[in-house]
Amino acid sequence: MAVWALGINHTTAPLDLRGRFAFAIDQIAPTLQGLRQSLGGATRHPQVETAILSTCNRTEIYCAGQQPALDHTLDWLAHSGGVSPSLLRSHSYTLEESLVARHAFRVASGLDSMVLGEAQILGQMKDAVRAAETAGALGTTLNQLFQRSFAVAKEVRTSTEIGAHSISMAAAAVRLAGQLFEDLTEIRILFVGAGEMIELAATHFAAKNPKSLAIANRTLERGEKLASRFGGEVMRLADLPDRLHEFDAVVSCTASSLPIIGLGAVERALKKRRHRPMFMVDLAVPRDIEPEVKALEDIYLYTVDDLASVVQTAQASRQAAVAQAEAIIDAGVQSFMHWMDQRSPVGGVVPLIQQIHAQADEWRALEIARAKKLIARGEDMDAVLEALSRGLTQKMLHGTLAELRAGDADTRAQTAQTVSRLFLRSQSRSGL
């Protein structure tokens, strides 16, 4: 079994390119079905395992199959994003075998994140695994890879201080707002969306006791739940253009495939505000706010990539924790590759074990069938059991005893040592 992966992230691709490959969680299942069909045709093995991890900072595809198909996987992803394979290749990374495990373990542990040590990525990876399971795209190999990723991430977090003093994207947004506004208790803030990222951002801003807080969302029910938690109001997304001018700060993160706050709406809001400054944070990928907005005077717009310098300020002091985490990951990679080697059809013990079990089950079925016939004829039960046990013993020992008599003296001596070790283990341990 081969494993391979490819992806783009905040270090290899700009925001707008990453936006072309962002998959909402409800898109994962049909997307995986299309990917598996495509890979099945390319590799002639329809049971290819696949999973997609898609966040604001990365989109990654993990695969397992009889033979790697990196080029075909890249071509498929390029087509899905509407770009040329050459463009995607120049902004992506491809991995095979142990490098896949190392990368997955580093991602789950927060070592590959924009925010070093952040814990949110682990939950996002678990969501990706659940989506793959629901789609029927996950098999033994990828399931093992991800379960080991979760175990390694847990050990990294409990054994190191990788997450200590980690500055989240939401906390970074609060810091930037504090640089623009003298007193955050005097600002009116609007959150667009009601997902996990907005919930985190609202938690950080609410701790500063702003003058007012509002949630704009497509569905009022979800928005009301979040607004009530922070003592804010809720509004429909459709009302956003008419009310945008009321807010000093706007934080947006939705799953929309197109911008929901356009240049014209912001220009009108600024005019109504008499050009008092507005602080805007776009945490969405693809963008929620048109990029042209950033060029407007009195607008301070930040994207997830703009926040990178803020969230990385505390990372240098955690390099010792990184070294400890990498050691844990090294051990995890070795363990996973050992598991893979055992399952290899060439030199792996798992296929041999499966064959031995299958042969033993065949012999058992034959002897049970023979015993049932004897019982049906009225044979003595003790005699039937004796015949059953002898039949099984003879079948299981026949090949071994034949090997002991085959070959020259040296071959027979080596075979005898092996057979003794396998069949007389209790005697050899006791010194008999």
Swiss-Prot record:
Class of this enzyme: oxidoreductase
Keywords (alphabetical) are:
NADP, Oxidoreductase, Porphyrin biosynthesis
The yes or no answer to whether the keyword Nucleotidyltransferase is present is: no
Instruction: Enumerate the Gene Ontology biological process terms.
Output: protoporphyrinogen IX biosynthetic process from glutamate
Q: Which reaction does it catalyse?
A: (S)-4-amino-5-oxopentanoate + tRNA(Glu) + NADP(+) = L-glutamyl-tRNA(Glu) + NADPH + H(+)
Q: Which residues form the signal peptide?
A: none
What EC number(s) are associated with this protein in UniProt? 1.2.1.70
| Residues engaged in binding NADP(+) | 193-198
The entry sums up its family as follows: Belongs to the glutamyl-tRNA reductase family.
Q: How does it assemble?
A: Homodimer.
Record remark: domains: Possesses an unusual extended V-shaped dimeric structure with each monomer consisting of three distinct domains arranged along a curved 'spinal' alpha-helix. The N-terminal catalytic domain specifically recognizes the glutamate moiety of the substrate. The second domain is the NADPH-binding domain, and the third C-terminal domain is responsible for dimerization.
Other notes: During catalysis, the active site Cys acts as a nucleophile attacking the alpha-carbonyl group of tRNA-bound glutamate with the formation of a thioester intermediate between enzyme and glutamate, and the concomitant release of tRNA(Glu). The thioester intermediate is finally reduced by direct hydride transfer from NADPH, to form the product GSA.
Q: What is this protein called?
A: Glutamyl-tRNA reductase
The organism encoding this protein is Paracidovorax citrulli (strain AAC00-1)
